[in-house]
Amino acid sequence: MKIRIDIPHHPYDIQIEKGCMAQAGQWLRELWQPQKVVIVTDNHVASLYAEKVKLSLEDAGFQVAVFDFLEGEERKNLTTVQKVYEFLVKQGLTRSDGIVALGGGVVGDLAGFVASTYMRGIHFVQIPTSLTAQVDSSIGGKTGVNTPFAKNMVGTFAQPDGVLIDPLVLETLGKRELIEGMGEVIKYGLIEDPELWALLTGLNGSVESILEHAETLIEHSCQVKRKMVVEDELDNGIRLYLNFGHTIGHAIEATAGYGKVMHGEAVAMGMVQISKIAEEKGLMPAGITQSITEMCQKFGLPVDYENWEVDKLYQALTHDKKARGNTLKLVLVPELGSATIHPVSLEEMKDYLVK
């Protein structure tokens, strides 16, 4: 299946197909003329797929080198970026060459940032290998790295030339790594897609059920992401809806220490906490917090952060990228399949941190 991201200045396709990673070279040849390519990945993904993708690209006429770094959110920083820059220089990459981001969200965010800043921007594509990356982070052009102050604090908007999604690679994920991706899938059902929510309701929550329906879950999620990105590429309007659960979720990730709590886990806890307080304030319908909680728990996602410290979380929130002056644009769900923006002051945000 192809989904067109029809952004006027940089349209591209998302290709979703079981087994398509084996044809990565042919796919890329249709996008780029054979040239130098660097595959950026982490050491875990490299051990599974780097050689397979490298050979496919070489068969298509590309000159390929591989850069891998130690896996983990804690490696998504400017130190790693500098190492990639140095590798690109040693390989002689020019502005006519490109990067293949092969991995999960950490790899995609970091490789995209490198591509958008090296020589003021070179071509790149995404081949996401985690559920979170396949349904969310590989699509839409947000790139970035973490700082000690906040998640993704340094970054750019830079669209890839294409996204290649192979649902079969999810079978090599560990249980926790697969389940955390469901945090984003559940979010899509809540903010925009009641049909997706109904599908999730019908699943039993097992790993087997996720893998069996992976292609459909990915397609639904990508369609929602497509709509938001095409209408609001630079995150000034409806694309903000994608941040449901992320305001508190990012604060949890930052205070826990990057890599301790996985992104989808933090999003799940953020959605539950925001909904609980918003429901108490009459801003979200009665019972929706219970529905979100039960859905997250069914798939094995955490709904409560055990190291909850209001002062630390609040401090992290003050660095949130969605803040405008003293105001945060909080995303709420007034009804299933619909989202809205609710501006709150940073002071009011303390209410949403009360357990």
Curated annotation (Swiss-Prot):
Catalytic reaction annotation: 7-phospho-2-dehydro-3-deoxy-D-arabino-heptonate = 3-dehydroquinate + phosphate
Single GO term (MF): 3-dehydroquinate synthase activity
A cellular-component GO term for this protein: cytoplasm
NAD is among the record's keywords: yes
Compartments it resides in: Cytoplasm
EC number: 4.2.3.4
Details of cofactor binding: Binds 1 divalent metal cation per subunit. Can use either Co(2+) or Zn(2+).
PANTHER family membership: 3-DEHYDROQUINATE SYNTHASE, 3-DEHYDROQUINATE SYNTHASE, CHLOROPLASTIC
Protein task: Catalyzes the conversion of 3-deoxy-D-arabino-heptulosonate 7-phosphate (DAHP) to dehydroquinate (DHQ).
Protein name (Swiss-Prot/TrEMBL): 3-dehydroquinate synthase
Species: Streptococcus pneumoniae serotype 2 (strain D39 / NCTC 7466)
Gene (UniProt): aroB
